[in-house]
A protein has these predicted regions:
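Helix-loop-helix hairpins and the membrane-proximal interhelical loops
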Residues: 1-46, 146-193, 211-214
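Membrane-interface alpha-helices at helix entry/exit sites of multi-pass transporters
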Residues: 78-90, 216-225, 247-257
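Short helix-coil transition sites and intra-membrane helix breaks within transmembrane domains
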Residues: 24-28, 56-65, 165-166, 194-203, ...
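Cytosolic, long alpha-helical scaffolding segments
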Residues: 79, 105, 217, 243-249, ...
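Hydrophobic core segments of alpha-helical transmembrane domains in multi-pass membrane transport
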Residues: 9-22, 53-57, 124-136, 150-161, ...
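Interfacial loop-to-helix junctions that mark the boundaries of transmembrane helices
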Residues: 1-7, 108-121, 174-179, 285, ...
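Structural signature of hydrophobic alpha-helical transmembrane segments
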Residues: 89, 113-125, 180-181, 221-232
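Hydrophobic alpha-helical transmembrane segments of multi-pass integral membrane proteins
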Residues: 43-69, 184-207
Length: 578
């Protein structure tokens, strides 16, 4: 082997790693979001979690990416630790798909089918197909094209590496190196170190398959190296869990314990068999498909051994990392960006909490208009601060999420949530304004006349009903509620004008001061604007256009086109008559 063979091997390695990287990236975009949502929904039992983890890892071709996703889900509360254990075991089996694809380079046989299945036959076809798909304007087709180009690139890199190391078969140093790796402990450490450095067990196994093409890697050397690769792949999840919640760190630790225990047990069995039986099979050169067989068999044996003991693994990490999380884990973890559907589900869950806080604050603000309770006022302010923080966190995350490659449906959901959280925050602001108006009435010792109190109660009851209608529509994702909300919102607009005119008339008759008139005007404005935001919420749920002008134009059109709209208005006008 000369310097040019060395450069070819290095170039092949670079192509291999680059191809695997862009293929995994495209597959994560193509399937990660949808499968991420399934990962959230299909983990109710340990077996379901196992098969879901297997499917997700096989689809994105990266156990490291799947584990980062799991850590993010546990950190965000989308998965419990118990659910994560089954998923983690599934990711180990799912990662065995890649070596089987790479073993196509070791196929032999003549004829058209045999030649087509070898890299020299299918790589040009995949490259052509990939380029055509990549030039498409459709995002999903572009991702498919990138995945095909990535696979073609990694197979070309694999061929280049295999051809370059073929000359190593006669190199004495290379033979001595792999003779040393027949020591199980050295092989285990070598596999773990290589995988930890490149942070991909699939890539590490691929490199081993390329070296196996030299004919100098024996079965006895390959087995402990593959065991070590399973340990080295844990580094990605461990690094990902740094700074995460205690439960997320436990999930990463389960992954490490699972692979350490499996490797330890089967390495001991391998060593005993090697010493006592010394089978000649261990001295035979391993083929590319042989590496895939060993990798698959080892991961299946580990799962068979430890799946029944999954509860013990969970209890072990609870003892190693005792205690409870001081606070709820990071509400929106950046790891969720790899699974847009699950990320949107979490965003919607938090938006629901935000809506509930805004509704509770509106109730407290209305109550403060007649009597300010210090404890209630303190809680309203605390919840208002939380609503503001949630809007900042959700808004920032949704903007980042919108920058990812999303399906049309997910993109629409992200835009809807961005609009909704703004309305929830403004609803909370108006509740805060009502509290301040109540405090102003108290501090200035202004009392509302009985007639004003009666009329105000009618308006606040209408506003509380429209808030319930709008927020229930959001929770149930019910677009039909928009018609009821629009009718009630029109009645509230009329009530506001009636109450404003009546207060002016009473002031002209000497009932109430100018200060009362100013506060009264502020209260009516806040209640009317709160109703407007409820109308916006129902409009968003109904899928009306974004933006104030588009939304209001669509609402006006609906009022004109709905033959039952006037009947609804009359019904609410009768209910809330002053």
């Amino acid at each position: 082997m000369d310097i040019f063979d060395g450069l070819s091997a290095l170039g092949g390695l670079c192509l291999f790693l680059f191809g695997m990287s862009i293929m995994a990236e495209a597959l994560q975009r193509r399937a990660g979001g949808r499968l991420g949502g399934q990962l959230r929904r299909m983990t109710r039992s340990r077996w379901a979690g196992f098969f879901t983890g297997l499917a997700v890892t096989a689809a994105v071709q990266s156990s490291s990416a799947a584990m980062v996703m799991v850590v993010g889900f546990v950190n965000s509360g989308l998965l419990t630790l118990g659910q994560a254990v089954g998923v983690i075991m599934g990711t180990n089996v799912g990662t065995t798909v890649t070596p089987w694809l790479l073993s196509l380079g070791g196929l032999e046989g003549g004829g058209f089918p045999g030649r087509l299945l070898r890299p020299a036959g299918f790589v040009p076809l995949l490259s052509l197909w990939g380029i055509i798909a990549y030039l498409s304007r459709n995002g999903r087709r572009r991702d498919t094209g990138q995945a095909l180009l990535g696979f073609a690139t990694l197979m070309q890199g694999m061929e280049l590496m295999s051809g370059s190391v073929a000359g190593l078969a006669q190199a004495e140093g290379f033979r001595r190196l792999f003779t040393a790796f027949t020591d199980p402990l050295l092989g285990l450490l070598a596999g773990a170190l290589l995988t930890a450095v490149i942070q991909s067990s699939s890539a590490s196994v691929g490199i081993l398959q390329a070296l196996a093409a030299s004919g100098q890697v024996t079965v006895g050397a390959a087995v402990p190296i593959i065991m070590g690769q399973n340990i080295g792949t844990c580094i990605t999840a461990m690094l990902s869990s740094v700074g995460a919640s205690r439960n997320a760190r436990r999930a990463a630790l389960v992954h490490l314990l699972f692979n350490l225990t499996g490797a330890g047990v089967w390495l001991a069995v391998f060593w005993v068999v090697k010493v006592l039986a010394a089978p000649t099979m261990l001295a035979r050169p391993v083929t590319l498909p042989g590496v895939a067989v060993i990798h698959t068999a080892f991961n299946l044996l580990c799962t068979m051994l430890l799946f029944p003991a999954a509860g013990l693994l969970e209890r072990a990490v609870l003892r190693l990392l005792p205690g409870e999380d001081g606070e709820k884990g990071t509400e929106l973890d950046s790891r969720l960006l790899a699974a847009p559907s699950a990320a949107l589900e979490k965003c919607r869950e938090l938006a629901g909490e935000m809506a509930a806080l805004a509704r509770d604050n509106l109730r407290r603000g209305v109550a403060a208009l007649t009597e300010v309770q210090p404890a209630s006022a303190k809680e309203l302010r605390r919840q208002e601060e939380r609503i503001d923080r949630m809007e900042d966190v959700l808004g920032t995350f949704l903007v980042r999420l919108s920058g990812q490659t999303l399906t049309r449906r997910d993109n629409a959901r992200a835009a809807e949530l961005l609009a909704l959280i703004g309305d929830f925050e403004r609803l909370g602001d108006h509740a805060m304004n009502l509290l301040e108006s109540g405090e102003e009435l108290r501090d200035k010792d202004i009392s509302l006349p009985a007639e004003d109190r009666r009329e105000l109660r009618v308006l606040t009851d209408a506003v509380e009903e429209i808030a319930d209608l709008a927020l229930d529509a959001f929770r149930r994702e019910d677009p039909a509620a928009q018609a009821e909300v629009e009718a009630l919102e029109q009645v509230i607009d009329g009530l506001k004008e009636q109450l404003r005119s009546r207060r002016i008339r009473r002031m002209q008759q000497g009932s109430g001061t100018m200060e009362l008139g100013f506060v009264w005007s502020d209260v009516l404005t806040d209640l009317e604007r709160a109703a407007d935001h409820c109308s916006n919420i129902a409009g968003c749920v109904a899928g009306l256009p974004d933006g104030n002008q588009g939304l209001h134009a669509a609402q006006t059109a609906l009022r004109q086109q709905d033959p039952a709209f006037e009947d609804r208005v009359r019904r609410y006008a009768e209910k809330y008559r002053v």
